Amino acid sequence: QKLCERPSGTWSGVCGNNNACKN
């Protein structure tokens, strides 16, 4: 799984099958 990038520029959570960010 790869990290998700938030609009603020920080990385948090993981990307699911639909690239959805889960905190």
Swiss-Prot record:
Gene3D superfamilies, per the entry: Knottin, scorpion toxin-like (3.30.30.10)
Modified residues (Pyrrolidone carboxylic acid): 1
Keywords, ordered alphabetically: Antimicrobial, Fungicide, Plant defense, Pyrrolidone carboxylic acid
Coiled-coil regions listed in the entry: none
An individual GO BP term: killing of cells of another organism
Keyword Secreted attributed: no
SUPFAM superfamilies reported in the protein's UniProt record: Scorpion toxin-like (SSF57095)
InterPro entries for the chain: Scorpion_toxin-like_sf
Subunit structure: Forms oligomers in its native state.
Family: Belongs to the DEFL family.
Entry function: Possesses antifungal activity sensitive to inorganic cations.
Protein name listed in UniProt: Defensin-like protein 2
Organism annotation: Brassica napus
